[in-house]
Amino acid sequence: MSGAPPAPRGGGHRWYGVARQLFFLVPAERIHTLVFALLRGVTAVGWPRRLLRRLLAPTDPVLASTVFGVRFPGPLGLAAGFDKDGLGLHAWGALGFGYAEIGTVTAGPQPGNPAPRLFRLPADRALLNRMGFNNLGAGALAVRLARRQPDIPIGVNIGKTKATPPDQAVDDYRASARLLGPLASYLVVNVSSPNTPGLRDLQAVGSLRPILSAVLAETSTPVLVKIAPDLSDSDVDDIADLAVELGLAGIVATNTTVSRDGLRTAGVDQLGAGGISGPPVARRAVEVLRRLYGRVGDRLVLISVGGIETADHAWERITAGASLLQGYTGFVYGGGLWAKQIHDGIAQRLRDGGFASLRDAVGSSARESG
């Protein structure tokens, strides 16, 4: 992976830059917990939530699209990992996201890896995590989803329980799909986190086929698979072909990288193992996206995630073939107005380019170059 690109200009607001400096004085997982609790508290009350939605939510009709039968008011969603248990279901629409992906959740509850397990790489505007799928379990999330009606689409990202042997992974994913499929706007099968031993081995087509087939058999909800940026090009092609063959709704590309190439933050090696998100994964995420679109075209929905910080980055992904986008690290570094800024920038570029809808822009640069 390459190092971080130059810092984006014009992104964020000065007040958040000051707040971020204060936040970054606190250990990463602790401040995440505190800020997340604050966001939930503010958006739990009707009138603040309605006010925030009025100010931040994507309402421009040019941003709306219907993807695998689900209407998304805007293409930028919150990536999996921020809200692992669906505790903030009403927060994300109020903060300007067009949808949110909850998880990763496993069939049974598990504590994840020992702390410390989340670190900032400020010189790279990146994060390093080895959380290990800490979550309350699929059953708890199912109860929460059944009780609430969020105002934006909610996807659910499912992973393998750490204690489950690889030869029992099919049953593990099947159990989560059975519980959560009827309650989610879409399901993502996560076989690409580097933080569960042996999980990435399940990306091999021979191992992946029975998992995806089992999940598809359990639910009529759209099913996607999330892949790693560290796959070889031939492995990306094989998974794309498998997804088309099985009738998946799409592919989420990409997860975090284990590569340390080109990082600028000092002392990264001392932080230990984990996946890196943010700008260091951006170049490979774009490469994988372009390869996937060239391989499958419009036969699959492509969701691009990894290193999106600005509207220019978002626009590059859309025109390269992404119907939807996701961000997590960009939100951490960009602040509460980040999603609105991205959506506003996309809307402006759609109009400047003469596109009548978001759908018209998806893959446009790939078609021109082809």
From Swiss-Prot:
Entry GO MF terms: dihydroorotate dehydrogenase (quinone) activity
Cofactor, how bound (note): Binds 1 FMN per subunit.
Metal-binding keyword on record: no
Keywords: Cell membrane, Flavoprotein, FMN, Membrane, Oxidoreductase, Pyrimidine biosynthesis
Residues holding substrate: K84, N129, R130, M131, G132, F133, N190, N195, N255, T256
Pathway this chain belongs to: Pyrimidine metabolism; UMP biosynthesis via de novo pathway; orotate from (S)-dihydroorotate (quinone route): step 1/1
One BP term from GO: 'de novo' pyrimidine nucleobase biosynthetic process
Protein name (Swiss-Prot/TrEMBL): Dihydroorotate dehydrogenase (quinone)
Native organism: Mycolicibacterium paratuberculosis (strain ATCC BAA-968 / K-10) (Mycobacterium paratuberculosis)
